[in-house]
Amino acid sequence: MLGLGVDRLQADINRLLASLFHQGVLDEQFLQLQQLQDETSPNFVYDVINIYFDESEKLLRNLRLLLMDREFSDYKKIGLHLNQLVGSSSSIGARRVRNVCVAFRSASELSNRPGCLRGLEVVEHEYHYLKNMMHELFQLEQQRILAAGVRYPM
C-alpha cells in the first residue's frame, strides 16, 4: 500500500521537475547537483539550495538599497553583486535567474538607472518563482520519504 503513495509522489516530483526544465527555470546543472547527493549526505541539494537562497537574499537586498539611493552612481558595485548572483545561480542550475541577471548587468554597464530598476524587478520576480518552486519540490520529496517509511538496516 505504501508503494502506491510513494509512486504517486515520485511521479509528481518528476512532473514538477520536467515542467521547470521545460520552462527554462532549471538547467542540467541542477541535475548534476542532484547526482552529488547520496546516502551519506541525503540533504545535500536542500542544503546547497538553501545556502543559495540565503546568500541571494543578501545580494538582492544590497541591490535594492543601492538603487533606492537617488544619488547612487557606482554602477560597478551593482555589477559586482550581479556577478555573484550570476555565478551562484549558474552553480545550482537556476537558468532563468541567471539569464535575467545577465540582462540586468547589461543595464548596469550602460549606467541605465531605469533599466537597472526594471532589471531588479525582473530578477526578484524570477528569484521568488524559483524559491516557491523549490519549496514545492522539497515538500514533495519530504512527503515521498515519509510515505516510504523508515527503513532500518538489517
Curated annotation (Swiss-Prot):
Main subcellular location: cytoplasm
Keyword field contains Acetylation: yes
GO annotation, biological process: cytokinin-activated signaling pathway; phosphorelay signal transduction system; response to cytokinin; xylem development
Subcellular localization(s) per the UniProt record: Cytoplasm, Cytosol; Nucleus
Gene Ontology MF terms: protein histidine kinase binding
SUPFAM superfamilies noted in UniProt: Histidine-containing phosphotransfer domain, HPT domain (SSF47226)
Disulfide bridge map: none
Superkingdom as given in the UniProt entry: Eukaryota
PTM sites of type N-acetylmethionine: 1
Gene Ontology CC terms: cytoplasm; cytosol; nucleus
InterPro entries referenced in this protein's UniProt entry, alphabetically: AHP1-5/YPD1, HPT_dom_sf, Sig_transdc_His_kin_Hpt_dom
Keyword field: Acetylation, Cytokinin signaling pathway, Cytoplasm, Nucleus, Two-component regulatory system
Domain spans labelled HPt: 41-137
Record-linked PANTHER family: PHOSPHORELAY INTERMEDIATE PROTEIN YPD1 (PTHR28242), PSEUDO HISTIDINE-CONTAINING PHOSPHOTRANSFER PROTEIN 6 (PTHR28242:SF46)
Function: Functions as a two-component phosphorelay mediator between cytokinin sensor histidine kinases and response regulators (B-type ARRs). Plays an important role in propagating cytokinin signal transduction.
Subunit structure: Interacts with AHK5.
Name of this protein: Pseudo histidine-containing phosphotransfer protein 6
Biological source species: Arabidopsis thaliana
